[in-house]
């Protein structure tokens, strides 16, 4: 029970630190958590927590790249502001490629992955600002491209 309470305290402190939007590296987050009294925290634990809570690196008001948590922790929807992060949607013979604002690709890919094969998406690979999407077996790349354009209400 005590470990559960410690874990909850760690999560609470972690989220509070990320809301400050001033940490540009995992090492800085480790140091801040150690200063908060979590002596056993290390970089790999911070990395797992960043992934678990969907944290991304984005620019803060000072235009510095920092870690932050997404506004919503559920699966994003196309009615959320995420569609505003999509800058370009294009395709070739094999893949659909989406370019996003820096740090937004993984969130957009998560949305697309949640739609799945029924919507024509076999899978996605996301970097910082680029997503590769491969069509499911019964869809052409062009059909997938058109469906994604409709999804994000864009005429690109």
Curated annotation (Swiss-Prot):
Keyword Transcription attached: yes
Domain of life: Bacteria
Chief location category: cytoplasm
Keywords, ordered alphabetically: Amino-acid biosynthesis, Arginine biosynthesis, Cytoplasm, DNA-binding, Repressor, Transcription, Transcription regulation
Gene Ontology MF terms: arginine binding; DNA binding; DNA-binding transcription factor activity
Biological or metabolic pathway of the protein: Amino-acid biosynthesis; L-arginine biosynthesis [regulation]
SUPFAM superfamilies given in the database record: C-terminal domain of arginine repressor, Winged helix' DNA-binding domain
Cell compartment(s), UniProt: Cytoplasm
Keyword Cytoplasm in annotation: yes
Family listed: Belongs to the ArgR family.
Function: Regulates arginine biosynthesis genes.
Name of the molecule in the record: Arginine repressor
Organism in which the protein naturally occurs: Erwinia tasmaniensis (strain DSM 17950 / CFBP 7177 / CIP 109463 / NCPPB 4357 / Et1/99)
High-level lineage: Bacteria, Pseudomonadati, Pseudomonadota, Gammaproteobacteria, Enterobacterales
Gene designation per UniProt: argR
């Amino acid at each position: 029970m005590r470990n559960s309470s410690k874990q909850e305290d760690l999560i609470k402190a972690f989220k509070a630190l990320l809301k400050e939007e001033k940490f540009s590296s995992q090492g800085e987050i480790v140091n801040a958590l150690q200063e908060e009294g979590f002596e056993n925290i290390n970089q790999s634990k911070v990395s797992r927590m960043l992934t678990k809570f969907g944290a991304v690196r984005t620019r803060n008001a000072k235009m510095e790249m920092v870690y932050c948590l997404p506004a919503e922790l559920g699966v994003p929807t196309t009615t959320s502001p995420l569609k505003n992060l999509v800058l370009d949607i294009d395709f070739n013979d094999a893949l659909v490629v989406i370019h996003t604002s820096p740090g937004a690709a993984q969130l957009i890919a998560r949305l697309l992955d949640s739609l799945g094969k029924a919507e024509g998406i076999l899978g996605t690979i996301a970097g910082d600002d680029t997503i590769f999407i491969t069509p499911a077996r019964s869809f052409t790349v062009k059909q997938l491209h058109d469906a994604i354009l409709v999804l994000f209400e864009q005429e690109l």
